[in-house]
Amino acid sequence: MATEEKKPETEAARAQPTPSSSATQSKPTPVKPNYALKFTLAGHTKAVSSVKFSPNGEWLASSSADKLIKIWGAYDGKFEKTISGHKLGISDVAWSSDSNLLVSASDDKTLKIWDVSSGKCLKTLKGHSNYVFCCNFNPQSNLIVSGSFDESVRIWDVKTGKCLKTLPAHSDPVSAVHFNRDGSLIVSSSYDGLCRIWDTASGQCLKTLIDDDNPPVSFVKFSPNGKYILAATLDNTLKLWDYSKGKCLKTYTGHKNEKYCIFANFSVTGGKWIVSGSEDNLVYIWNLQTKEIVQKLQGHTDVVISTACHPTENIIASAALENDKTIKLWKSDC
């Protein structure tokens, strides 16, 4: 169920974009975004764990400790369907590039591949010996990468559901896995304090990123252009790395993150922002270049565990834990 936020007249009028006299091709990042709450999506009966927009921009998928995946309209928050089949809670969900398939990672030690339109489970991926915590398709969507509390990273064949490679990746639970934009590399992060870059084809570790300190790494992903890595650590810090040089370029702070694996994002549809949830129940938005906090979104009543940025519009989805259980859709003019 989506409830819509009603705006006072004056604010709605003020939110109309004004025509710009100098509409140049490459716009500099605006000073600040103005994300406002548009819809609250209620339906999950336990903590929400992950939210992801479909690559075609039509849908939002959510996963939860209630063992369910729910599909919602990306623009209006309208509930579309529930997808069920896992025996225990789900920690992550991810879309295929054509927006037709989903993969989910569950505490039942399996991943499942789903046909979204029918809601049917096409394959169950078995092999991990502990909770599966994170998953992603490669851009070609013929492979899936998963990370588990069994400390391994696995690469799976989408068509057959067979495990192609098991990487003895880390010495603690794996918190995130992500392919770069051509699918040639995988990045993984772990509570062992490391980020590792893997060659997809060979399964070889190409690079290990180590900071001076080594707090648990709770999330990692490649930037859209594939040159950088965004990594979250459980010392209330997000860092942007040039991984080829092994150098930290930017540090983003001000939020609270010491306990949970909170997703972070690059927002690139308008201004260039970094977006993350936080343990103080807020969504934080930073200017990517200047590292300053440009907006904090208030409304959730528990830890904001997951945020997602729409592929083409200035829309953020956020999701929160057990005391809240809702998903919120926020929109900005820039």
From Swiss-Prot:
InterPro entries assigned: G-protein_beta_WD-40_rep, WD40/YVTN_repeat-like_dom_sf, WD40_repeat_CS, WD40_repeat_dom_sf, WD40_rpt
Skewed-composition ranges (Basic and acidic residues): 1-12
Coiled-coil intervals, chain numbering: none
Alphabetical list of Gene3D superfamilies matching this protein: YVTN repeat-like/Quinoprotein amine dehydrogenase
Sites bearing N6-acetyllysine, chain numbering: 112
Disulfide links within the chain: none
Chain positions of cross-link Glycyl lysine isopeptide (Lys-Gly) (interchain with G-Cter in SUMO2): 7, 27, 46
Modified residues (N-acetylalanine): 2
PROSITE patterns attached to this UniProt entry: WD_REPEATS_1, WD_REPEATS_2, WD_REPEATS_REGION
Polar residues: bias regions: 17-28
Presence of keyword Nucleotide-binding: no
GO MF term set: histone binding; histone H3K4 methyltransferase activity; histone H3K4me1 reader activity; histone H3Q5ser reader activity
Outcome, altering residue 133 to A: Strongly reduced affinity for histone H3. Significant decrease in interaction with KMT2A
GO BP terms in the entry: gluconeogenesis; negative regulation of transcription by RNA polymerase II; positive regulation of DNA-templated transcription; positive regulation of gluconeogenesis; regulation of cell cycle; regulation of cell division; regulation of DNA-templated transcription; regulation of embryonic development
Domain of life: Eukaryota
CC terms in the record's Gene Ontology section: ATAC complex; histone acetyltransferase complex; histone methyltransferase complex; mitotic spindle; MLL1 complex; MLL1/2 complex; MLL3/4 complex; NSL complex
Cellular compartment(s): Nucleus
SUPFAM superfamilies (UniProt xref): WD40 repeat-like
Annotated stretches, region: Disordered: 1-31
Outcome reported for the amino acid change (mutating residue 107 to A): Strongly reduced affinity for histone H3. Significant decrease in interaction with KMT2A
Family, similarity comment: Belongs to the WD repeat WDR5/wds family.
Classification via PANTHER family: WD REPEAT-CONTAINING PROTEIN 5, WD40 REPEAT PROTEIN
Quaternary context: Interacts with PAXBP1; the interaction is direct and links a WDR5-containing histone methyltransferase complex to PAX7 and PAX3. Interacts with HCFC1. Component of the ATAC complex, a complex with histone acetyltransferase activity on histones H3 and H4. Component of the SET1 complex, at least composed of the catalytic subunit (SETD1A or SETD1B), WDR5, WDR82, RBBP5, ASH2L/ASH2, CXXC1/CFP1, HCFC1 and DPY30. Core component of several methyltransferase-containing complexes including MLL1/MLL, MLL2/3 (also named ASCOM complex) and MLL4/WBP7.
Protein name, as recorded: WD repeat-containing protein 5
The species this protein was found in: Homo sapiens (Human)
Gene that this polypeptide is encoded by: WDR5
